[in-house]
Amino acid sequence: MDQDFNPFFDDPEEQELLNRLEIMLAEKAYYFFDVSDWEDMIQHYLQVQQFTKARKALVHARQQHPVSREISLCEADLFLDTHRYKDAIAIIKKMERETPNDPEVQRALGTAYSRSGRTYEAIQCFKNALNMQHEDSGEIYFQLSCEYAVLGKDAAATYWIQKILETDPENAGALYDLGMRYDAEGLFDEAVRFFETFTEKNPLNQDGWYHLGNAYLNLENFKDAIHAFEYAIVCHEEFSAAWYGKGEALLRLGQHHDALESFNTSLEIEGPSPHLHFEIGQCYEFMNEFNKALHHYNKSLEIESDFEDALIGKAWCLYEMGHFQNALESIDKTLVMYAKNADAWLVKAEICRKIGQASEVDDAYENALLCDGESWETYLDYSDYLFTEGNSEAALFILERGILQTGNDSDLAYRAGVYAYLSGKTESAFNFWLVALSEDPEKAPQVFDYAPNLYKDSRVLTFFGDFKNEL
């Protein structure tokens, strides 16, 4: 027997069976085992990928139980695990001819077809098994869901996951798979409908409440998300993921102290993780406690040294703390790894603005727009930099470019009007503002937020007053 053998069975009696088999395989003794014992021991060897021992065990098992269906299925599993798909299918097809109405044989054949890439045939076999087996169908539902997912038939895959939950609402794995499927497909409204109905029927199911909260979170319905996560926590007080989700919703609502409390509770339950330390860092950053934020970003990076968001957060904290050169070095290192991250380029632009590296600022903004050309906020920031540097023509050009690229005719046009007006281009300014007002008149106050002195300009006040009177 191998000295470094890693026991699979926890039960002493089962471990003793395995020890006896090891002696038998070493040809030092002969023992008789029941079919179920052979099945368990062969599956153990397959699970730990000791295929040579599995083959030897199968030889002995065949000698002791020559017509056993279970031993034949084990042999098929060995062929599948060693990529001998045709041999596996041949064995199972022979069994199918002998017992055509056996659901286990149909499931085994479906698995063999699935492993060999024959998805449609796998689906048919699993459906055959379903017709033959009317109880304990959850695993077949799951297999059907997987096969339809392979084919890209998301609605069918979702349907079969839902079937699992009809018969087994406590199946946390099925709930997780369904939640992830809704997320991947962007079906957040459908997720809310399903999990609302599910939690009405299963009000004490923590996972159902959690996934409902996650669906609300994706829809940016943060208050309902918090309520759902709180119900999940009532069902299971140490549900770390629910505390995390609640913290995320609170953070998005700007309730930073409460969010921090939720994240810290999750940290106490789950222990350190890069994402938890990052979220805690975010809370402190929004509270302008940059030393503490930096501490947690560094904690996050100790666990995962290339965590993108934490690297950017670290550079930003260094900037806010006045360590501009360190901030620049930090963001430059980040950009070596993540050159396509628009936020990283925007942080660099801000740092370079502060230290007066004008050529680097332009380059950073242009790179940010290359990474995310749909961000109208970046066009606003870039134009603000150019305008404050006295380059009003370039600032207007950037905004016009942004309007064409993003289709945002309100925020960008309001700002373009300000630049034009302050540059003496009154007619052009009014044209920009007319476009913006026709698109979204409610945003007109941002003109005066950016340039408060315009409150004292009678022509501007008259223009906006006349437009309001026409509405």
Which positions does each model-derived feature cover?
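Canonical tetratricopeptide repeat
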Residues: 74, 108, 143, 177, ...
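Canonical positions in the second alpha-helix
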Residues: 61, 94-95, 128-130, 163-164, ...
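Structural marker of alpha-solenoid helical repeat scaffolds
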Residues: 64-65, 97-99, 132-133, 167, ...
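Start-of-helix register in tetratricopeptide repeats
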Residues: 36, 70, 104, 138-139, ...
